Amino acid sequence: NNSIVVGTGNKVEDFGIGFYTKYGDGGVDISPIADLMKSEVFKISKALQINDEIIDAKPTDGLWDDDRSDEDQIGATYNDWELIMNILENGVDPDEIAEELKGKYDIYIKHHMANKHKMIGIPICKIPKELKS
């Protein structure tokens, strides 16, 4: 029907900690905000005059019957993740990260490494031509 699935993941969720379901909310054709940090999405939302109720809503994946937020599940705030991602993108040695961020850095790395498979394309096994015939 000439349609595409548009993703809603931001850079922190999609390429930082991989906080999405690979073939669920990660199964998209285009992801227009995936290069924006969560704070940048908020700034754009305010500039576009998106309803404050939407902007101020607690981020949640909606998979639980309680009120746990993304941040409750992940163990840190989106601001923490952004700070750590910015530090890493600027080439700072992880050993130089401030002591108060070390625990959150460790959580970030744990999530990032566990979910890295979501952030790369599907691996393809190249079959030699002679085996195909």
Q: What are these regions, as identified by a protein language model?
A:
Residues 1-133:
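ATP/NTP-dependent adenylation/nucleotidyl-transfer catalytic domains that generate, transfer
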